[in-house]
Amino acid sequence: VKLPFTTKHDLRDNYPFGLCAVPMSQIVRIHASSGTTGKPTVVGYTRKDLASWAECISRAFTAYGAGRSDIFQVSYGYGLFTGGLGAHAGAENIGASVIPMSSGNTEKQITLMHDFGSTVLCCTPSYALYLADAIKDSGLPREEFQLKVGAFGAEPWTENMRHEIEEKLGIKAYDIYGLSEIAGPGVGYECECQNGTHLNEDHYFPEIIDPNTLQPVEPGQTGELVFTHRVYAVTSLPYA
């Protein structure tokens, strides 16, 4: 049986809850995109969805070398955006301490990072660079900070940015991949080798297809990435 693709247009055409696959009584959280290019794309989560999402993000953090003894400073935005609450849940799931900073308020970010001894920073790569410059301008010696790992995503970044972040903050900078339409961050992640993305294939089954024939391409060929995922609350099988 061939299944049709679900696209962002389908989510918008069925705004807000037309693609929900469970009763609203089973949906315990709702996230949505900003809606800057159209109606927001809305995704609901059951308790099982939240648990599996936290597990996927936990794997990313573990692959970065983080663990129970770490202090996570989560500087992604909290709210409808998935980054803040997603990273928060993943860090708590491995037993780490979490500072729910959210984005902005850079001066306080630096103060608490310094005073609390944050060891893992979660934010966008562009904000990490901004923080690095702000720390330098603050006059606080870099050696007084305990940061060792950065989990960066939610926007494109380059290897040059990675090297600049690592040099300025004295950390290892890792990419975390996701998309809000099928949960959020944690679909894929780097490991300590920093040489490509590992996918949580027991939760998100990837295929690369020819957009014209809709058939899988041969290894090494360019195509469109689609995911079939195990999310209970929303029907998007597979998502293109």
Describe the residue ranges of each PLM region.
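Short, conserved acidic/polar surface loops in the N-terminal third of protein domains
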Residues: V42-T46, A66, G83-G86, T111, ...
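Acidic/glycine-enriched edge-of-secondary-structure segments
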Residues: G38-S52, H88-V98, S118-C122
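Short Gly/charged-rich anion-binding patches and loops
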Residues: V28, C56, G86, K108, ...
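Active-site glycine/GP-rich loop and adjacent strand/helix microenvironment
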Residues: I94-A240
